[in-house]
């Protein structure tokens, strides 16, 4: 919760500085900021209310006049709501000067920019300096030590966005993510957290969701799943759940949300499959903060894993090169029993 609050405050500070001219900026940051605002994402699509109507001295004075962090957050949040709600744009200000198409174009490009800043997409549209620019931008005070969910690998993040459909759906997803951030800060998702923690363990339908490549079924996964079941664990396993005519994406998403833990079996084939990439992205969104991702390296070492994907967070993993199936399951049972006790 604390890292989200820090991130959100820094993100708001960033939005304010993008919308104004902060006279205290370092020379280096002024250069990067100008480059950001002139980059293809936002070029010619920044609404007048950002470029012209917000003089920094008035904007910051207004923020200070309204009050502290909570009021400032509410103000910016309402601004986002208005951007998303095109029907009320005409009431955004008394002069009714905002153009719906202009704001829609800006919003679309700003979302693309946020996605790229939040991922490892270091080079785009021939902008050779983008790699240096992005690294500089993300290491400035706004995003230093930012939460892990923003350090996502682009192939997972972008695949997830693409899987949800077009611009309208993508905009809705991003809007929902902002709502989640704000609800977390308000504490609505953390009320009586310690009391609800153990209750949630018993509410889920499955103990474990098994994410794996179908290529690994015969030499490891089937035996692994059968032994889990023999130990009395309920397991979400695609061969048991997904039948002909089922929507695979919906079944996977439901399975992840209905499980207490996720076992991810990393292998060479795992990184080649679009479905395992989809699972992987959703698993880390749902489970990482609660330390409920249980990784297994199948015929891989940590060094091998980094070659495939250097963005995977540092979590203790068990390797099939070092442990038998029985030993791996013993470790998993200990981890689950530790949580329940």
UniProtKB/Swiss-Prot annotation:
Start and end residues of each TIR domain: 204-336
Annotated disulfide bonds: none
InterPro entries, sorted: TIR_dom (IPR000157), Toll_tir_struct_dom_sf (IPR035897)
UniProt keyword annotation of NAD present: yes
Catalytic activity, EC: 3.2.2.-, 3.2.2.6
Domain of life: Archaea
Listed Gene3D superfamilies: Toll/interleukin-1 receptor homology (TIR) domain
Molecular function as annotated in GO: NAD+ nucleosidase activity; NAD+ nucleosidase activity, cyclic ADP-ribose generating
Keyword Transferase: no
PROSITE patterns: TIR
Binding site for NAD(+): 213-214, 243
GO biological processes: NAD catabolic process; signal transduction
Catalytic-site annotation from UniProt: 279
Substrates-to-products reaction catalysed: NAD(+) + H2O = ADP-D-ribose + nicotinamide + H(+); NAD(+) = 2'cADPR + nicotinamide + H(+)
Keywords per UniProt: Hydrolase, NAD
Matching Pfam families: TIR_2
Described purpose of this protein according to its UniProt entry: NAD(+) hydrolase (NADase) that catalyzes cleavage of NAD(+) into ADP-D-ribose (ADPR) and nicotinamide. In addition to ADPR, also generates a cyclization variant of cyclic ADPR (cADPR), termed v-cADPR (probably 2'cADPR).
Free-text note regarding domains: The TIR domain mediates NAD(+) hydrolase (NADase) activity. Self-association of TIR domains is required for NADase activity.
Protein name stated in the entry: Probable 2' cyclic ADP-D-ribose synthase TcpO
Organism: Methanobrevibacter olleyae
């Amino acid at each position: 919760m604390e890292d989200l609050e820090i991130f959100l405050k820094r993100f708001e500070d960033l939005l304010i500085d993008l919308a104004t001219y902060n006279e205290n900026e370092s020379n280096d940051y002024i250069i990067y900021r100008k480059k950001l605002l002139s980059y293809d994402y936002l070029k010619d699509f920044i609404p007048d209310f950002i470029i012209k109507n917000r003089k920094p001295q008035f904007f910051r004075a207004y923020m200070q006049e309204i009050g502290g962090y909570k009021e400032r957050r509410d103000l910016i949040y309402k601004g986002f709501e208005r951007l998303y709600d095109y029907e009320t744009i005409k009431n955004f200000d008394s002069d009714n000067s905002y153009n719906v198409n202009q704001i829609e174009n800006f919003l679309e490009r700003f979302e693309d920019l946020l996605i790229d800043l939040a991922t490892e997409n270091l080079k785009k549209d021939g902008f050779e300096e983008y790699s240096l620019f992005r690294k500089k931008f993300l290491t400035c005070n706004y995003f230093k030590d930012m939460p892990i969910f923003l350090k996502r690998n682009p192939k997972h993040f972008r695949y997830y966005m693409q899987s949800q459909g077009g611009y309208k759906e993508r905009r809705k997803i991003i809007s929902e993510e902002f709502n989640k951030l704000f609800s977390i800060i308000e504490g609505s998702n953390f009320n009586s957290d310690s009391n609800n923690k153990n209750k949630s363990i018993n509410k889920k339908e499955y103990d474990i969701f098994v994410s794996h490549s179908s290529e690994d079924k015969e030499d490891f996964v089937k035996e692994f799943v059968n032994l889990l079941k023999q130990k009395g664990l309920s397991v979400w396993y695609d061969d048991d759940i997904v039948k002909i005519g089922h929507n695979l994406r919906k079944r996977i998403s439901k399975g992840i949300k209905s499980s207490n833990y996720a076992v991810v079996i990393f292998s060479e084939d795992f990184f080649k499959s679009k479905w395992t990439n989809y699972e992987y992205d959703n698993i880390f969104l749902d489970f990482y903060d609660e330390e409920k991702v249980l990784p297994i390296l199948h015929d891989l070492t940590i060094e091998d894993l980094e070659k495939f994907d250097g963005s995977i967070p540092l979590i203790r993993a068990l390797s099939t090169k070092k442990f038998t199936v029985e030993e791996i399951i013993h470790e998993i049972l200990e981890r689950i029993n530790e949580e329940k006790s």
